[in-house]
C-alpha cells in the first residue's frame, strides 16, 4: 500500500503495542512492540537502500537503548519485530524506483516478499537480533529513565 501510494518510508520507530496488556502474551517473550513506519510523499528525502548486519545492529541498539530509558526491556520477539520494521523501510526505499502499481496484488506481494527475504539474509537478521539481545546495557541507561518526562519538554 505504501508503494502503491507513491510514498517513501523515512523512519521506523519502536512503540509499545496494545499487546502489553494481553494476559496470554505477557511473560512469553513474544513481541509487545510495534514498528511505526513514518511515510511521506516527499521525493527528496533520502532513505536507506542498503543494509548490512552492522547497520541493522546499530538501529536495533538505538531502539533498545531508547526503550530502556523508558524502562522497557526488549525481548527477542520485540527485537525481531523492530528489526523487520527497519528492513521493511529499506525494502520500500529499494523498490520505490521500479514499483509497478498496476501489477496484480499477488505479483506485488511476491516482489516485496522476495526483497524482504534478500534483506533478511544480507543483514544476517536473526544473528544480529541474538547479538543485540546478548549485550548488557549499562546501568546508566536505566538511571536516566524518565528524564525527558520530568524535563522542560512537559513543564
Model-derived features with residue positions:
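S-adenosyl-L-methionine-dependent nucleic acid methyltransferase catalytic domains
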Residues: 1-155
